[in-house]
Amino acid sequence: MAAKPGSTKPSGKDSNKSKPLSSASKVSKKAAKRPPPKEVKSKARTEASQLKKKKKREYTEEELDLPKLNAITPVGVVKPKGKKKGKVFVDDQEGMATILAMVNAEKEGQIESKLQKARQLEEIREAKRKEAEARQAQKKNKLEETKAAIRQKRKRKGDSNEDTKTDTTATQPNGSSSKSKGKRKSVSFA
């Protein structure tokens, strides 16, 4: 492996080491032949298969387990149109009267129980109010007693002070009474 004249590059194995990418880029892989992608066309809405409505399965009442309401309309009773569903029709007046009596009795019982509860609550409120009033009266009495006791103490102290003052003023002359009020130290500056 002779080097080309005028070339400064090293020859042989050294050139491969310096350019590893150039040798790798020359190697080409065989591209796998793939068929071209097929276009999926959406069917028009007017096509017969889309226009045809599919039959939905209809369930029987037994399969659905629905409660039976107004299954039989009694003879002589005409259902008024436009009224709510779920009404119970009674074929005889006696049955209707018994049902009404039962419902009224229940309602009256509920009303009575409500009245009883209201009475009980009112009694409880009244008792609480009386207790609160009694507590307030006790507080007032206690306050009045303490006030009276304080007044009595003041009177006792005042009486004893007045007695002692009169005694001291009567026995001592006027000049010495000022000294007896309190021991004051006086400082005079010359």
UniProtKB/Swiss-Prot annotation:
The keyword Transport applies. Residues 103-159 form a coiled coil. GO terms for cellular component: nucleolus; preribosome, large subunit precursor. Residues 1-67, 127-190 are annotated as: Disordered. InterPro entries: Loc1 (IPR037650). It is found in: Nucleus, Nucleolus. Residues 180-190 have a biased composition (Basic residues). GO terms for molecular function: mRNA binding. Residues 36-46, 127-148 have a biased composition (Basic and acidic residues). Its main location: nucleus. Keywords: Coiled coil, mRNA transport, Nucleus, Ribosome biogenesis, Transport. Belongs to the LOC1 family. Required for efficient assembly and nuclear export of the 60S ribosomal subunit. PANTHER family: 60S RIBOSOMAL SUBUNIT ASSEMBLY/EXPORT PROTEIN LOC1, 60S RIBOSOMAL SUBUNIT ASSEMBLY_EXPORT PROTEIN LOC1. This is 60S ribosomal subunit assembly/export protein loc1. It comes from Aspergillus oryzae (strain ATCC 42149 / RIB 40) (Yellow koji mold). The lineage of its organism: Eukaryota, Fungi, Dikarya, Ascomycota, Pezizomycotina. The gene is loc1.
